[in-house]
């Protein structure tokens, strides 16, 4: 279970949220068997999605982040509900790359830079909001910052990090997002820049035992902060046999007829690796169900 906190400055000029997502990213690594660099990429995206999801107002709202820079990891995707509960995957869960020139895991090399970050917000309207920006670095935090500046016109500071142990378990993972509110002027921007000019990486702060609340106060020492809310997000998949059945029906009757010829049809959830098995009799029932819908 993760820990997430959201704060607002007393002067009403900015918000800051921070999260410890170590348990969440560990769970993702267990499910997908990710290599170190893919754990770092997926973990950063899961953390960003959790933070962004927690800021959604509607109980049933959700946000999905998808990044594909034509790197060896392929598409990396993370989705969050409005409580910050997340799930995600990378198309290629095992990628081995040398460390980058800073001696760190080469997330940019795994993700690639030739592509887009897509943000899909389902706010319960007729159509979801979709924003898309070109990848800036493939390091993910910079790409999230660029998304907010370009698509939502919100000045943002985003920091994300994942520390991977030699045995591929996750030592620490987390991040923070600072966002200026419309009341902020140039002096506030200067104040924020001064605050963050010499801070430790977020994983270093977590490794020192700092809580998300302490991280918020550490990165913005010049601001008095009021806590908005706290939550304990987790890695949570919402797949079910009913959802998988609906997905199979949506393929159309012709495809279902083909599946009926197989001894069994196995569908595996990309997010949690749970397997759903459908026998020819199950497919028959789905065909009947789809016929009933067509007759209405």
Go through each PLM region and give its residues.
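Cys/His-clustered metal-coordination modules, chiefly Zn-binding fingers
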Residues: 197, 201-296
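Interaction interfaces in information-processing and related assembly proteins
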Residues: 1-229
């Amino acid at each position: 279970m993760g820990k997430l906190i959201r704060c607002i400055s007393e002067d009403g000029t900015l918000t800051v949220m921070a999260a410890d997502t170590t348990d969440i990213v560990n769970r993702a690594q267990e499910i997908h068997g990710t290599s170190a660099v893919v754990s770092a990429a997926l973990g950063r995206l899961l953390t960003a999605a959790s933070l962004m999801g927690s800021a959604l107002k509607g109980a049933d709202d959700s946000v999905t982040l998808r990044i594909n820079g034509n790197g060896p990891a392929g598409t990396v995707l993370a989705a969050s509900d409005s409580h910050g509960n997340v799930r995600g995957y990378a198309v290629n869960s095992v990628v081995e790359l040398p460390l980058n020139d800073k001696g760190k895991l080469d997330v940019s090399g795994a993700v690639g830079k030739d592509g887009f970050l897509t943000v899909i917000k389902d706010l319960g309207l007729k159509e979801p909001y979709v924003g898309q920006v070109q990848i800036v670095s493939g390091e993910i935090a910079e790409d999230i910052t660029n998304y907010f500046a370009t698509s939502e016109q919100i000045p943002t500071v985003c920091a994300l990090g994942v520390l991977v142990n030699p045995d591929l378990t996750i030592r620490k993972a987390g991040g923070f997002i600072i966002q200026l509110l419309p009341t902020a002027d140039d002096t506030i921007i200067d104040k924020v820049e001064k605050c963050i000019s010499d801070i430790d990486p977020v994983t270093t702060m977590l490794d020192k035992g700092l809580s998300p609340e302490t991280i918020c106060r550490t990165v913005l020492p010049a601001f008095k902060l009021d806590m908005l809310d706290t939550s304990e997000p987790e890695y949570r998949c919402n797949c079910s046999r009913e959802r998988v059945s609906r997905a199979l029906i949506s393929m159309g009757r012709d495809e279902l007829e083909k599946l009926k010829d197989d001894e069994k049809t196995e569908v595996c959830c990309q997010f949690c690796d749970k397997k759903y098995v459908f026998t020819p009799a199950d497919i028959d029932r789905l065909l009947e169900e789809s016929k009933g819908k067509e007759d209405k």
